[in-house]
């Protein structure tokens, strides 16, 4: 039974060109995140391949120093995301992004818009160098 399910998954991945979509939309997503880095000092680095991406949050971009735990940056950012309509798991100062392989560029734009707004709000509350 599990082999049949695996074969069906492979069939769907091939039929819907999900590998190509992951590469194309992943590159677009990463470029959008790099644009956010230009506008938000809180972003120390953006890295990844395809749709597996990470955004590192820092208090000082030059030294890549994180935030003191008592600032609860991850918890506060999670709250900002929820307030702005995005459910996102932030467990540390690294946002790990792994959306579905079928994500579209317009959906990426929506996510990036909320990231932009939420990071902007958080940046006004914490000291960033």
PLM regions: where:
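Conserved N-terminal phosphate-binding loop of PLP-dependent enzymes in the Aspartate aminotransferase
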Residues: 1-129
